[in-house]
């Protein structure tokens, strides 16, 4: 299985992990670039709008995903099932990642 090395920084903690890519991934580099771009956009929005609730953010992400699933040429239910499975695996990948404190915390 292909793995994408990825790093997240949250609350003075650095997490290095490997995200399990789908077996039919065409370009792991683009997966990483798109992910990084979307995460940065969300982070910038949250910094400008600190009262944004997690619920509102997750609804916005759900709308984004629903839109992309709808306009894709694939069967919606199969894509949603794949996304759910990949999200669960992604959470496991992050949990298994190497965590290290950064800064003076």
Range-by-range predicted roles:
Residues 1-105:
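Solvent-exposed interaction surfaces and binding hotspots enriched for charged
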């Amino acid at each position: 299985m292909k793995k994408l090395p990825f790093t997240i920084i949250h609350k003075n903690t650095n997490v290095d992990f490997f995200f399990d890519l789908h077996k039919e991934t065409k370009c792991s580099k683009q997966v990483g670039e798109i992910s990084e771009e979307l995460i940065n956009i969300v982070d910038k929005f949250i910094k400008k709008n600190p009262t944004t609730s997690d619920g509102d953010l997750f609804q916005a992400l759900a709308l984004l995903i629903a839109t992309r699933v709808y306009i894709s040429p694939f069967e919606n239910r199969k894509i949603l099932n794949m996304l759910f499975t990949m999200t669960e695996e992604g959470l496991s990948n992050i949990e298994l990642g190497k965590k290290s404190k950064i800064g003076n915390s």
